[in-house]
Every structure is written in C-alpha cells, then in structure tokens.
Design a protein with these regions (language model features):
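Positively charged n-region of N-terminal signal peptides that target proteins for export
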Residues: 1-4
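Bacterial N-terminal signal peptides
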Residues: 7-16
Length: 122
C-alpha cells in the first residue's frame, strides 16, 4: 500500500511539472506598457504644423515619451462648424491631411523621423 501511495504521488508530481512546462509564458506587449503622448498639432506649437512637431521630437524623447498619437490630422468640416476654427473631430475627409498642418510629405517626414528616434506612432 505504501509503494502504491508513493507511486501515485510521484506520478502526480510528474504530471503537474509537465503541465507547467506546457503553459505559455505571458509576455507583456508594448501596447500594454507604453505611455502615449497625444499630439494635437494645432495646439502643439505657435506654428501648428507637422514641421514644428518634428523639431520638438528630441524634447519629447527626453521627456520619456514612447508613443505619439497624432489627433486629428484630417481637414475640418466647414458645415455647421463651431466657432471660427471648427472642431478637429468633425472630419471633412478621412483620407486627406489638413493643409493647415502641412502636406502629406510633411506628415510622412515627422513619422519617419519619429520612427528613427524609436517612437511608436498612432
């Protein structure tokens, strides 16, 4: 009886050890640990342009920013707009860049430079 009990305990121990080896180790993905800096281009600088944001990337890096979230960058709808500037969240065209901020090439430039510096960009 004692041998049977010890054999059963040994068997259970081996089964539990092999079960632990089969479990996947949970990895923490960057999206769960990163900090995010929302870049509202219009209010980011006096110029309110992509080029002005690009000049400030080193400062954002020194601040410890890891991810840049550009919000919003589309042209602003003019129909029923609020105030003189309108709401940036009222997009006129989701496939275009707001010309007040610069060109598509200007936006690509700031994104490319941000990537070179190790930022993630949303």
């Amino acid at each position: 009886m004692k041998k049977l009990f010890l054999s059963a305990m040994l068997g259970l121990s081996l089964i539990s050890c092999s079960a632990l080896q089969n479990q996947k180790t949970m990895t923490t993905d960057w999206k769960h640990t990163t900090n995010i800096y929302e870049v509202n281009v219009r209010q980011f600088s006096k110029e309110g342009t992509f080029k002005a944001v690009e000049k400030e990337l080193p400062r954002l890096k020194r601040m410890g920013v890891e991810t840049l979230w550009f919000m919003p960058i589309t042209p602003i709808a003019q129909k029923n707009k609020k105030g003189t500037l309108g709401s940036q969240y009222a997009a006129q065209d989701y496939t275009s860049i707001n010309p007040e901020f610069g060109t598509l090439e200007d936006f690509k430039s700031v994104v490319n430079e941000a990537h070179k510096m190790g930022f993630k960009v949303i």
